[in-house]
């Protein structure tokens, strides 16, 4: 490549055509050098040479500002500090993947058996081909390119709505700002933002030298850097990126790529300048999956970054389409984790934590021990039965691990280490916080405080849950402020939050008038919410974000949910008898209804609509399978229509299948249905069937 700096005249003396040609050449050279340095780890020029070209480009763009484009290397850090992160709805949901609980070879065998069963394969059919990738311990990210330029980067968030962090992601030099001409007009690349261990250690050293905040582990450091409001701070953090998949992309029929395998897709992303992990491999069948899991695990500590397992993906994209998705996870992928790292330490005490629902959780206070990249001082003991099973006592030397490499827990007591007799731990008869009676319901392992919102601990946890980002998202309402509000008896229940005023808040410790006003503004903003967020924020037992969305989608209004019978609740997707009974009991309690009424009276509101009309149960008792791509309906929409008509939608074809609904690129399921003589319908035929035609 010719040196674009040769015979470089004064930028101000160049006409627009000359400047444009020189700018294009410099950008091409800088992008090439940056790819060699940041992606390939193979720099080809000294830093001084890169800096000289970069400064020349800056001078040219300053002299000819009309020629500046968003994908220029000089545009990686730009703009003022943001006031907040903007929510972004993903064009396609960023779903999580299922985790195999068996960390040995059985995990690979279970996944392979499940995939074969879903596809209707027998032992006589050939082994399935899989791609095996490292499971990075970082932050999931979606990069959206339009007309081959990076226009948006968003975090996963709750899978449907993330946060726009484009200003920060542009600072990561491994991520291309522009793509080659053979890339499609629309491309959303999904991957992981992470930090190498050596870079993390160096960052903490710099922070300590500057008396700054140090970080617990590389993942937390990366996540915090990505969510900065000031991109200049993010630019100083050594963030990196690995690509591992796609979201929205131009369809093959509209000029987009037509990949046949996931592995081919990864190689294309690599050719477009995206970093792809070197440890990606191909496996055929369960035995090869288990072998790669073991091989990568053996090299785990030698890798420059943290992984907590591997991810298996069915390689053939047509088979991925055939397998489809469960409610929140793809059927064609799974995470197979490694056994957690373990270390010995001493139990210095056992204390009780009272949770939002009154659950009393014993927590072991430990002599500090470094496990899996963090210093651990506390570990959960779960419940009294777990303590008795493991025979944990104060003073014991125990083995501690980070379960899933995240949550510390006590594995067991090291034999022969108990120095003297210590009494067994006993669960108290009364709550250590409020003095209310402690009970254990029949069939449950957990003890609970009966104090309800009378218990300050439960009240505090309920307020924090209500204010959480994925609930009412009340910015500034953290644990220290909640402690003050409850201890000062300014807030006894959720509605009291909306009765706070500037005078009362300003009188609190470390609460200046500006901070108080900011909280009042956040409370005002939270009054406009959504029904799923409100339901989740109430902290109902067994009701997480996904169940809250299912309830809102099914019933449409809060009143319909509150007045639903157990039988009506059981009709909601993924709700079983325990959850239905718990929900019904909650809304039958006058106190809970009064809390909801007061919150509404305080101005909380959300869009509501009547639940969707359900077609007659024309397909009651029928088993239906979906395969391929339908012309107008998405897979979930088609499933909803069929289930609303009483059908059971399954993932595999068998003799019990009543109908196969087949779209474009239908694969093995279509062949199996024809072999068994099962009626095959297209989308129009399905709609006609639902209409009773």
UniProtKB/Swiss-Prot annotation:
Residues annotated as domain BRCT: 614-693
Top EC group: ligase
UniProt-listed GO biological process terms: DNA repair; DNA replication
Keywords: DNA damage, DNA repair, DNA replication, Ligase, Magnesium, Manganese, Metal-binding, NAD, Zinc
GO molecular function annotation: DNA binding; DNA ligase (NAD+) activity; metal ion binding
Residues bound to Zn(2+): 431, 434, 449, 455
EC number(s) per entry: 6.5.1.2
Family membership noted in the UniProt record: Belongs to the NAD-dependent DNA ligase family. LigA subfamily.
Protein name from the UniProt record: DNA ligase
Organism: Verminephrobacter eiseniae (strain EF01-2)
């Amino acid at each position: 490549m010719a040196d674009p700096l040769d015979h470089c005249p004064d930028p101000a003396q160049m006409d627009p055509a000359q400047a444009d040609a020189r700018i294009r050449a410099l950008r091409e050279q800088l992008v090439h050098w940056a790819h060699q340095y940041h992606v390939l780890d193979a720099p080809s020029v000294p830093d001084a040479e890169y800096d000289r070209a970069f400064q020349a480009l800056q001078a040219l763009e300053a002299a000819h500002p009309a020629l500046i484009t968003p994908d220029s290397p000089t545009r990686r850090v730009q703009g003022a500090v943001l006031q907040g992160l903007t929510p972004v709805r993903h064009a396609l949901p960023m779903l999580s993947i299922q985790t195999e609980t068996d960390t040995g070879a059985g995990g690979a065998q279970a996944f392979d058996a499940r995939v074969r069963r879903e596809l209707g394969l027998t032992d006589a059919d050939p082994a399935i081909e899989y791609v095996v990738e490292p499971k990075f311990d970082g932050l999931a990210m979606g990069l959206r390119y339009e007309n081959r330029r990076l226009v948006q980067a968003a975090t996963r968030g709750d899978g449907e709505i993330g946060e726009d962090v484009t200003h920060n992601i542009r600072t990561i030099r491994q991520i291309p700002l522009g793509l080659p001409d053979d890339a499609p007009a629309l491309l959303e690349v999904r991957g992981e933002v992470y930090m190498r261990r050596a870079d993390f250690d160096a960052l903490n050293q710099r922070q300590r030298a500057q008396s700054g905040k140090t970080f617990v582990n590389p993942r937390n450091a990366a996540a915090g850097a990505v969510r900065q409001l000031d991109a200049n701070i993010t630019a100083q953090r050594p963030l990196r990126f690995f690509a591992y998949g796609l979201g929205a992309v131009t369809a093959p029929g509209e000029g987009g790529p037509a990949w046949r395998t996931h592995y081919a897709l990864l190689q294309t992303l690599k050719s477009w300048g995206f970093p792809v992990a070197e440890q990606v491999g191909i496996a055929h069948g369960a035995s090869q999956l288990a072998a790669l899991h073991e091989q990568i695990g053996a090299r785990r500590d030698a890798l420059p970054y943290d992984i907590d397992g591997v991810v298996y993906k069915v390689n053939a994209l047509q088979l991925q389409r055939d397998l489809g998705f469960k409610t929140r996870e793809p059927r064609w992928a799974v995470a197979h984790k490694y056994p957690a790292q373990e270390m010995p330490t001493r139990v210095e005490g056992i204390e009780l934590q009272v949770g939002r629902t009154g659950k009393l959780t014993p927590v072991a206070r430990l002599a500090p021990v470094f496990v899996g990249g963090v210093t651990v001082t506390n570990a959960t003991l779960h419940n009294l039965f777990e303590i008795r099973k493991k025979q944990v006592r104060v003073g014991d030397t125990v083995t501690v691990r980070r379960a899933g490499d995240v949550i510390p827990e006590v594995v067991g007591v090291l034999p022969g280490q108990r120095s003297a007799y210590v009494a067994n731990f006993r669960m108290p008869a009364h709550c250590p916080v409020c003095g209310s009676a402690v009970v254990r319901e029949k069939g449950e392992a957990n003890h609970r405080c009966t104090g309800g919102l009378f218990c300050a601990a439960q009240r505090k946890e309920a307020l924090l849950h209500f204010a959480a980002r994925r609930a009412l998202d009340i910015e500034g309402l953290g644990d220290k402020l909640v402690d003050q509000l409850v201890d000062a008896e300014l807030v006894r229940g959720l509605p009291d939050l909306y009765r706070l005023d500037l005078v009362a808040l300003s009188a609190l410790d470390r609460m200046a008038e500006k901070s108080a006003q900011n909280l009042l503004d956040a409370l005002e903003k939270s009054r406009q919410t959504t029904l799923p967020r409100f339901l989740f924020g109430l902290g109902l037992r067994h009701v997480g974000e996904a169940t809250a969305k299912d309830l809102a989608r099914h019933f449409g209004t809060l009143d319909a949910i509150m007045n639903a019978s157990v039988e009506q609740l059981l009709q909601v997707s993924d709700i079983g008898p325990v959850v239905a009974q718990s929900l019904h009991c909650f809304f039958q309690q006058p106190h809970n209804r009064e809390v909801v009424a007061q919150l509404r009276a305080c101005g909380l509101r959300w869009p509501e609509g009547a639940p969707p009309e359900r077609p007659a149960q024309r397909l009651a008792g029928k088993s239906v399978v979906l395969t391929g791509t339908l012309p107008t309906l998405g897979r979930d929409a088609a499933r909803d229509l069929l289930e609303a008509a009483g059908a059971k939608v399954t993932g595999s074809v068998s003799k019990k299948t009543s109908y196969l609904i087949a779209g474009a690129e239908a694969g093995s399921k279509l062949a199996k249905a024809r072999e068994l003589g099962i009626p095959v319908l297209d989308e129009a035929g399905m709609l006609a069937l639902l209409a009773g035609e």
